[in-house]
Amino acid sequence: MSQGKVVQIIGAVVDIEFPQDSVPKIYDALRITEGDLQGLTLEVQQQLGGGVVRTIALGTTDGLRRGLTVDNTGEAIQVPVGKATLGRIMDVLGNPIDEAGPIGEEERMSIHREAPTYEDQSSSIELLETGIKVIDLVCPFAKGGKVGLFGGAGVGKTVNMMELIRNIAIEHSGYSVFAGVGERTREGNDFYHEMNESNVLDKVSLVYGQMNEPPGNRLRVALTGLTMAEKFRDEGRDVLFFVDNIYRYTLAGTEVSALLGRMPSAVGYQPTLAEEMGVLQERIASTKTGSITSIQAVYVPADDLTDPSPATTFAHLDATVVLSRDIASLGIYPAVDPLDSTSRQLDPLVIGQEHYDTARGVQSVLQRYKELKDIIAILGMDELSEEDKLSVSRARKIQRFLSQPFFVAEVFTGSPGKYVSLKDTISGFKGILEGEFDDLPEQAFYMVGSIEEASEKAKKM
């Protein structure tokens, strides 16, 4: 094991000089062996020549000084994997941070791995029911697929994510891995207690690298979580992998890239944006042995979907759930935009003709309503034809019926959460489209589960 000395420190970036004949490889983990920060891990990012390597620190560099001895471990960062990680909260290095003692003697794996080869990969078209009406209807998820939840600040990405985890973990009863990448510590804490109260904590591994962590931690924590998910997949399981938030992964890459002295590209992002995203996303794949279904929250800066970060993420996904500020401002939650959200599964050969026709019918009615909004604003409803009046009335009912009370929001709303099966979702929307509920007031459709509840609610109004 070779030893080197710290020669330069620039924020989270540390340069270390090794003997010329034993320079560490790219991605090798190095460890500080003396001083206040003994045990601090550094990851090699560049070889500068002359025996000097440039590393990124996975922890604070406050108190680091030149001349300290550094050991080369000779391998990439190794994190614990397997059943010992379930029910535990870990940091980027796999160390427990939940004060529940050490993680049992388990297998360790490198966080840097190759993506599965073409021969090993498998594609499935089996649907994953989420119990959330708008998602199951308009942008259905595939088992083993990749889903992105896109939204600006405060439109409900994390709440939607928590509801999906709760519904799928309880109904699907598989293992899940949750990677908290650069999000609020409070949300991580809420999430832990939510899982504990729902009695699904023993099926979830939690890996956190929160907002206050150095950029190295936030950049690598997604890979740590992914490695744990890959292990479950390779054991032949169907595993769920949740990332909140993919944008912070990109942002950490931007910070690291600037510190490493690379020229920034568009909007100040790193020049390697597409490649860094690809390295992560290509590993999130299903193989012939098991599947990884991944659900990722994607922050959209300034609500601009054409920003390079969300735009790069779009290319990798099978389904996109777009959360809209306009819909949230109407008080309709989940604030999913049914006209902007897409899914590759929305195909009659996959979901069946009835589901497809209902989804497209809902979209066309909502699209017509959107087109008529200007006319209504200027001339009022009375100027519309009878047909258009009916369309608008149905569209407003559909819009309200797309809302749904969440289990994870019970404490705030006071109304119990609802899980709606796909069959009930389709029959409800089909009924509205066919005019079976034209006589009910539109308020009856707001924040209910199935269509029967809307009919019950109408009787009390």
Swiss-Prot record:
Alphabetically ordered keywords of this record: ATP synthesis, ATP-binding, Cell inner membrane, Cell membrane, CF(1), Hydrogen ion transport, Ion transport, Membrane, Nucleotide-binding, Translocase, Transport
Pfam families according to UniProt: ATP-synt_ab, ATP-synt_ab_N, ATP-synt_VA_C
InterPro entries attached to this UniProt entry: AAA+_ATPase, ATP-synt_VA_C, ATP_synth_F1_bsu, ATPase_a/bsu_AS, ATPase_alpha/beta_chains, ATPase_F1/V1/A1_a/bsu_N, ATPase_F1/V1/A1_a/bsu_N_sf, ATPase_F1/V1/A1_a/bsu_nucl-bd
Compartments in which it is found: Cell inner membrane
Binding, ATP: 151-158
Enzyme class: translocase
Chief site of localization: membrane
Entries under PROSITE patterns matching the protein: ATPASE_ALPHA_BETA
GO molecular function list: ATP binding; ATP hydrolysis activity; proton-transporting ATP synthase activity, rotational mechanism
Bilayer disposition of the protein: Peripheral membrane protein
EC number: 7.1.2.2
Coiled coil: none
Source organism, top-level taxon: Bacteria
Catalyzed reactions per annotation: ATP + H2O + 4 H(+)(in) = ADP + phosphate + 5 H(+)(out)
GO cellular component, one term: plasma membrane
CDD domains: ATP-synt_F1_beta_C, ATP-synt_F1_beta_N, F1-ATPase_beta_CD
Keyword Cell inner membrane: yes
Stored NCBIfam families: atpD
Family: Belongs to the ATPase alpha/beta chains family.
Function statement: Produces ATP from ADP in the presence of a proton gradient across the membrane. The catalytic sites are hosted primarily by the beta subunits.
Quaternary structure, from the entry: F-type ATPases have 2 components, CF(1) - the catalytic core - and CF(0) - the membrane proton channel. CF(1) has five subunits: alpha(3), beta(3), gamma(1), delta(1), epsilon(1). CF(0) has three main subunits: a(1), b(2) and c(9-12). The alpha and beta chains form an alternating ring which encloses part of the gamma chain. CF(1) is attached to CF(0) by a central stalk formed by the gamma and epsilon chains, while a peripheral stalk is formed by the delta and b chains.
Stated name of the protein: ATP synthase subunit beta 2
Organism lineage: Bacteria, Pseudomonadati, Pseudomonadota, Gammaproteobacteria, Alteromonadales
